[in-house]
Amino acid sequence: MAALKQLVQSAAKGSRAWLGSTVMALSCICASAQAQDLLVRNATVHTASARGSLQNADVLVQGGIIRAVGSGLSAPAGATVVEANGRPLTPALFGGITETGIEEVLVETSTVDSSLKMSDQPLRPEFDVTLAYNPASVLIPVTRLEGIGFTALGATPGGGFVAGQGGVMRLDGSIDPIGPRALFLRIGAAASELTGHSRAAQWMLLQQMIDEARGQVAADSPHALLTPAGRRALSRYLAGQGRIVVEVDRAADIRQLLRWATREKVKIAIAGASEAWQVAPELAAAHVPVFVDVLANLPASFDQIGATLENAARLQRAGVAVSFVQRGDATHNARKMRQLAGNAVANGLPWADGLAGLTRVPAQAFGVADQIGSIEPGKRADLVLWEGDPLDVAHYAEQVWLGGRAMPMRSRQTELRDRYLQRNAQP
């Protein structure tokens, strides 16, 4: 009660915008049982499934689950009916590989939990950033306003090239990830300073880690790299229980990675992937999904000399499953994911594949496509009704539903905007 009193007093002193955004986030946490029956009627339903796009279609939601997709569906008694009038309805979008909920202010270290910096024992694959996830982060409403309903929470390298584990978080106030964990690591020039300034050292260290996880190196060896917990964590990925996401750009490194994945029989995905188009047939044959940094069309390093705006389109034509990723401030700019998909479409990627890269493909890559990523009966009702083309940044999301619950279409940013649009507004 004392803490609540202090919070209210703080709000009275001018923190109402912060309080409002926090209450919004907390309301999502507390409303998990409040999903109502819903019928969205006469929408252009982009299912992101084999059914494609359906004109003048209805979507029926009961108990937070999509129950039917078709025409002329009847609303159950008490259901909320939304007349779409032909506007687009899509699955909730993917926000990319981010630190949403584990990074609030990048320069304030007390709010950043995405990396582990331990110089004496830098290789800790058991490090799991989902344990630090804050569903009340003020970034979540900001991100959700743009139609984004889930993100891959990713560990970032701190003291070692193996960053740690993450997982898929739905932005509905849930505190737990869905689906299996993913392991994140970095290969190439970007990891050079973490591995003795040599790519060869990266593969050497990775191989020793695998040998340890498989019990080929004694746990008490003075040369051991992993803790017992680290060995157990890595062994799960070697058994196929989760995907290893590798940030890599250079074509030669991607080829080496494909050989390694085939030899060790592990499931991988590639992120960044500036020169992936040069290895497209091999990636397609190995069924490796690629998360493309679409706007990386200039060589920021020698690993990216082959960068091109047509990367995503060339990969798609070769049969590679393509999604998107941002490098830089992906967390605070998750809303730009639609722009990345739109740019890929402008440079040759088919529109349907652009949408799939924001919905079905990442859900499949992270092992949650049985729950989210498409509009199909039996899936969670994570939906977005759009004012116009969702891949055109000139248009916007009118309403987001997660698990059938209408999400508040406001954030701390919009509340500050509305406050200071008023004449003589005071801070």
Predicted regions and their residues:
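Polyanionic/metal-chelating signatures
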Residues: 136-139, 144-268, 396
